Amino acid sequence: WVRREDREGSPRGVAVAGATAGEGWSVNAYQNFVNSKLQVESSGGFVPVTLPDFLFDFQKYLLDWAIRKGRAAILADCGLGKTPMQLVFADNVVRHTNKPALILTPLAVSSQTVREGEKFGIEARKTSGDVFVGVNVTNYEKLHHFNPNDFAAVVCDESSILKSFEGTTRQAITEFMRVVPYRLLCTATAAPSSSSSAATWTR
């Protein structure tokens, strides 16, 4: 909390996002708190390298926006093609940076994502730690096998699943993503059920 005077001049607490310290922060302490919330990389994307013909127009529009933003969320209902959009986002980053991209999926979905890649001509490999310069696919539970500095992009499939993880796992995922310059969250069930799940998304 930080102190602020209300209209009558009496002090009252004002919540600072994520702050738990008591009143009376020094300027340096508050600045350190703000700095701790800054993103590692500056935001901003790039002009898409490719928007393949197999995409529908609305998918191209969403991807053009997401790639130019660099950090985005695609909230699309079931059946609207989130998997090909994830693959194209990751493939664009690989082509732009010549560095690997990582797609995180629920346990039962990683093999399906690889098959979708084959269907659409995007090479994607299921991996448990061996990384290649291309689209790597793994499940959330294996994230600890990877180094975030190896990747230019990370894509979270069914990102609403993050709220179901216990605190340490959720924190590990958000800290991993925080280091990676290009990020995409995808889900069909976007509504956060609590302020903590909304905060996880914004990180």
Give the residues covered by each predicted segment.
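Short, compositionally biased segments
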Residues: 4-7, 12, 188-193, 200
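SF2 helicase/translocase NTPase motor core
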Residues: 5-7, 12-14, 21, 25-181
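Conserved helicase ATPase motor motifs in RecA-like P-loop NTPase domains
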Residues: 78-79, 180-198
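PAPS/PAP-binding and catalytic site of the sulfotransferase fold
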Residues: 87, 194-203
